[in-house]
Structure formats: structure tokens, C-alpha cells
Amino acid sequence: MKSNSSTAVHSNAFNFGEFVSGGVDPRTGMYTCALSLGKLHSADLNGPDVTFSLSFNPLNQADVGFGVGWSLTMTRYDLRSKIMTLSNGERYKAVETSTGLKFKEMKLQTAKVLVTGPGRYEVRYKDGRRELLKVMAAAQIAVVEKIVAANGVSITLKHDVFNQFPVLTEINDAKECLLRIARKAGQVTLTRHPDTASSSDYKLILKNSLVTAIELPVGKGWDLEYEVIDGARYLHRVVNPLRAVEIIRYKQQGHHFVNGVERTLPFVIAHDVYPGRGQSRLCKTYTYSDRNFLGHGLIPAKDDDGDPLYRAPGTYVYTSDEQLVVGGKLHTLIKRTYNKFHLLVAQVTTCGDAQTTVATEYHCSVAKPFNEQPAQFRMPKVHTVTYLDRRTHQQRKETTVTEFDGEGNLLKYVEPNGVTTVSEFYPATGGDNCPEVPLGFARFQKKSTVTAAAAGGPSTVTYYDYVLHPALAGAELASVLPIEERDFELVQGVEVLRSKTERSYLDTPDDPLKHGATREQSVTRNDKTIRTAFSYELEGTRLRVISSTRGFDDALQTSEKVLSTRTGLPLAEVGVDGERIEYEYDAIGRALRKTIAAGTIYAASTQWAYLAASKQQMATMVTTDSSGGEQRVAYDGLGRVVTVQEKDTDHPDKEGLIPTRTLYSAMHDAAGQKVRSTLTDWRDGKPCPVVTLYEFDDWGQISKTLHADGRIEHTVADPVLRQQTTWLEGLGKTVTLVNEFGKPLSVERFSLKDKSLGKTVYTYDGSGRTTSQTDPVGNTTRYEYDAFDRLVRTVLPDASEMVTAYADHSDEAVPVSIAVDGRVLGEQTYDGLNRLTASIVGGRKSEAGYEAGYTQPKWFKGAGGIKYLYLSYCFKMHFC
């Protein structure tokens, strides 16, 4: 039987995250590779962002400009095959109409495609983004020539033809080139921000049209090797920048197609990962059922234009098994079951006596044909996690219920603890407080109601209002922006307003930098309003955002943040007290330096250096603090910390002759668990290691800790009973029961003879807040809270009541009075910026005053009447 890979394989199994994001896809058995190379920001951070990602698909055996099988994740439409590939990697067969493209297999309209002219298409997304496509006649493929953000700001894309395929060459915004792609023999170079000080190169090294290495601007990159199966290339060996090695093995005569099709599709049967640096290999093997995502066992339809499984009977399912092998024996088995719509309906994970089953019911009915399924048929409806102890046969279930509408909006969410969130959305045509949505998607939330579980607790309602913001000059469509949120608490069925948030935006249609940016945000509680105004200043490639917060009493506080317009990373921050912090980064966004009080006599810097992994050394991050102390953290190929070393700062070594000393090291087993850690102290230049060993139970949790001093710590965590038992060998036990919120219901201590030494019991409301605590002798303390989860009332065992009141302008824990049994013991006063201005305790009053908007007091007046002035504090550190 012939084995073959083909781009003609059509299955919606490829439109799921495991396939699109890379790795071994348990649905299909394919090993794909997706390498994220960062995000491109545009238009001074006010334009569309482009995810910069390269992906390998073994089913694509063409070289479209990046090497065989490799491509950038960009939207395109092939007029010959009628296949539309979206920017998220999903692929759909299209039906062409006079007005646009329709996709029979895209029930939930995450994207709409319009025909805007001869050879031109427009892809509209739910988030308001648009992509304008133009057909390149030489290739008969439509590619993106412009991406327009919801606010109207756009970027343009340029393409050329390579090997009869359109290939991206440049991405530009209105100011500069964001990305340039150049090709020469044996190499493809992707340059971010070319011809600028921020320029950085990513290189694909090719040999015989195969990508054999991907080089990063700094440090190591990826090394790639392939296996050829019937003329098709499959990744066989992948080495990542940390030098972990992946080995992928395939079964050549793999998945069978529908009956009568004489070919097979290879699948992965083993995936080994070698982290290196003395860490254990991770070994996984895979097996698959005869029935598969290709529809083996089905009679092929005359019209094979769609997914064959969509025409399968409702009983058609296929499975895959993933086995984690440790020491040549099965350690963990994961069995996955998929229905005819490629939806994961069951996942059973078994390790020894521990078994966890995740079952998912969807908004679909497998008994009905595809054309009768609702738009949200792929969305989960009931998600049930079952914990089973196979030794005792006891089990416990946790259920999550979700409900989606035909637009994919989440209408109802019931958590396992019983807390329920119900949402309403405005229709695409809008409503009283929402304009018509320009792109025709119903995506704006109208109302959200959160109801506590059966035990009671606060229920809240939030309303959302929106406005149509004018279009940017030259843009076709206006944008919809949120302008108001009103938060209510339900008190005996009556909505009581607790806070209101209002937003306004800059209306500068001729200025893309500021148009649509937030101008002011105000929060009102109890008729007291706190306003924050924002201003924006562009200084080359530095965007300064100034936030000015004015309290209800007119107190003003200002802070600043400077962002790189090319990376979006913070370059500097100025806090409300004038403290300044500056940051520096390398070409791939890693921190290089952090300087506090830069440019002053108080300047102090922390620096980072990154040593690339090699045969001689591990990938290492070197941190040097302001006093010259140096720490080296080394990582294995999976990014796990394996050693920490430091220099002896007590005995400075200016010549750098004294080697660093190892303070910490770790070892991991073949299941990926940390089984050994060593902490090393140094005395008179000699190491004094302290070794701790760990053992794990079948649930993957630490069950035994062997300390260096001989102590043996036991932990039995039982997810079935929601019980945790801990003890030191030779001592009594502590048993803790937890509730649905993961909080303790009771903590009971036992003697060596299993005699109870006392039990503390807790109760909770339906929001998971503690309502009472009863100690081992029966004393009960009760608690009450306000709508912002602040403790307002405590009733002690002797019936004494402690009542705490908070500032009515804030939702933070800012207490203004504490009273016991009706008698006020203390009072405090805060200004509109939550700064303490006065305090009365036992009739004695103290006061504080502040300069401008600083948080530190300028003066303090004690109860004795003496006034203290603080003159030594440097308020404006960046000017000192």
C-alpha cells in the first residue's frame, strides 16, 4: 500500500490548537512546529499588531519562500483549490458567491469574507480587525495587502512571487518599514525594523530547500533535521535554543483514508525529549485507533469536497493513546476520544491507582447531520472532571456548565463551586446604549450578573454602555468604544449602585497616535468621583504616557510611563513620588538593565547577561546587582532551573579570580518531576550541602519529603475526598478538608495513637468568603463583608462586635473607623488619593500633610502637638 502526504488532505481536525500551535497533535498524529518570533507593533502602538510566527506543516511539501513546509501565518485565499487560510492557521473550503465567500464548515462566523471588487476580498474579524486581500495573478492566490485595526489605523504588506507562490517581502506602517524579508541562496533573512537602531535579524538557513537552522538575533536558535517518507519531509530532530533535543519517530504506513483510497498518512509513534545537563529523558509513545480523523472505515462520498467525518454516523469516534514511559515501563496513560466533529469528548489520564476523566458535552448532536448543527456546535456545554481512586473505587465529580449563543458569546458560566455568571450581549444592530456594530458582529456585552452559590453571598450586576467613535481620517468605518460601566449589588432583589466607571476618548481624526486613545477615566462611589486624565507625547520611538489622578477633594497625583513604540516594552517609569526607573532590553526583548534613580547620585542598577547554551555550558542568566553581587542561574533544555551560583560578596574579588559558588541544584526524573534539590552553604570556603529528596504519588503530587537532618515529611493529598493529611514521621497527623473553593473546611490534629487533639471548623458563603471559625474548644468567631469583600463585622465568641467602616470613595481596604460594641476606638481620615491625613486613637489626634501628590508625608503632627517636618526625603529623585 502506498504511503503519501498531500496538501489535498482536508479535515477540520487541523483547525484545533494542538495542530496550529505545534508539537504532537494527538488528534492527527502529526508533529508540527510553530516558532513564535515576537509581535510587530505599528503606528506608535496605536495600530494593528502582527503576530510574527513561522510554522511547519508536513502536509505542505511546497517551498513557498521559507523552505519546504514552512510558512508565515498569514491570511491567504487560493482561487484554484478554493481554500481560505486565516491568520490563526485555520483552513476552510470556500463557496464563492457574487458578494463574498461562504464556508460550509465554518458554522461559527469568526470571520466574514466579502468580495470588494475584481480580484479583491475583505476579511472581517469579530474583534473589529479587517484584512484587505488582492489576487496576485501570477499565482492565483489572494494575499493581504493591508491590515486595518478597529480604530482605522492600518499597515500595508508587499509581496513578490517565489516558486509560483506569493511571498511576503515587507510590512510597513505610515512611518517606517516594520519587517523586511530578503532571500538569497541558502538563506532567508527576516529583519524587524530594518535600517534603524532597533534592527534585528532572524535567519532561516536552508539546505536543498529545507530549513536546517533558525538563527535568532542573539544567542542560539533552532537546529532541524528531517526524515523523508515517500518523498515527503517530516521533522525528525529538533534542537531548541536551550539545546533540548527532540527526537520524533513515525510509522510510515500510518493512518488509512476512507475506504477505497489506496494511501496512508504517517503518524508519530514516539517523541523523546532530552533536556540535557544530567536531567532525565522524557519519553512518550503514541498509538491510534483504526478509525481516525480521515474517516477510515467510511465509504467515500461522491462529493468529497468536505470533511468526510461530517457525513459519518453519530456513533463514529476515534481515539489516541499517549503513554509516558519511565524506566521502560508505563507511567501515565492518556486516552483521548474524539467524535465525528473532531471534538474531544473524553480524556482519561491513568497513573497507577489515580484516574482523572475529563468529559465534555458540546452544543452539538452527533445524531444530526452537519447542516442541522447550531452555529455554536463546537462550543462546550458541560465539562465534567471525575477523580477516581481505582483502589477504593471512590470518585468525585466537578462540573462546569457553559452556554454560548450563535455568535460564540458566553451567555452562562457555572463554576464547579456554584458561582454563576450570566451575560447578555447587544445584537449587531445595537441597542439603547450601544450603536450598530460596523462589521456586523454581536460582540459587545450588555449586562453581567454574578450570583453566589447556594450558601449565599453577594450577587452583583454590571451594565455596559458604548458609543460610536468617529472614524480616523481616511478610514472607512467608525469604531465602537466602551464609555460606562455601572456596578450594582443585589440587596434583597433591589439593585443598589456601588460604583460607576466612565471613559472618554481623544477625538483627533488627523492624528493616528492619539485618535481613540483614552482621555479620561472617572470612578464614582457614593457621589465622590476620582478622575484620571491621560496625555500622550511622542519623542521619536518613545511614547510617554502621563497619568494624572485627581481625588474628589482636588488632590492631584501624577505618574509617567515611557514605552518603546517598536516593542511595546516599558523604557522608563516615574512614580507618584518622583522615583524614576529605566529599563534596557536586548534584541529579543530580554531585560538587560534596570536603573533606579537614573542620572542622580542615588542611581543603582541591576544588570542581566544571557549566556547561550553550548556543549560546555548550560543556558545561563547572570544577574549583577548594584553592589557588585553576581548570581548565575542555569537552565536545562526545558527551561527548568538546575543550578544557582553566586559570588562571595562578603569577600569581594576585584580581579574576578574567585569562582562562583553553587547554592542550589536540582534533578528531575523521567516523568518531569523534581526529585532532588540541594541547598549549599559555605563555611571557610568549604561547601556544606543539604540534600532534600522528593517522592510523588499517582496524582503527581509530592507524597514524601526526605530532609537532610533525617526528618521525613509525609503528605497524602486525596482529590477524591478533597482531603490532605500531613505529618512528620514519628509525630501526629494533621488532616485538612477543603471545599469547592479550595479553602479549608476543617483542620484536625491527631496524636500518634490517632486520637483527635482538636478540630478547627470553618464555614463560607457562596462567594468563598469565611463566615465563621470555630476553634477546638467550641469558640466561634463570625465574619461579615461588604460588596468589595472587605471585612466589616466580626463577632467574637463572647458576643463582642467589632465593626470596621471604610472610606466611601474607595473599594480598597481603607478603614476610617473601628468600633467595638458600639464604642468607637479609632478613627482615620483619608484624602481623595487614599493618603492618611488624620488619626484619632483613644481621643488622641495626629495629623499628616503632603506636598503635591506624593505618598510620603511632608509633615507630621503628633498627639502632643509637636509638628515634625521631613526635609531629608528627596521627593524628586530624578532631579537630585
Predicted regions and their residues:
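Intrinsically disordered, low-complexity segments enriched in small residues
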Residues: 1-129, 215-217, 240, 252-253, ...
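Extended charged/polar low-complexity repeat regions
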Residues: 35, 52, 92-880
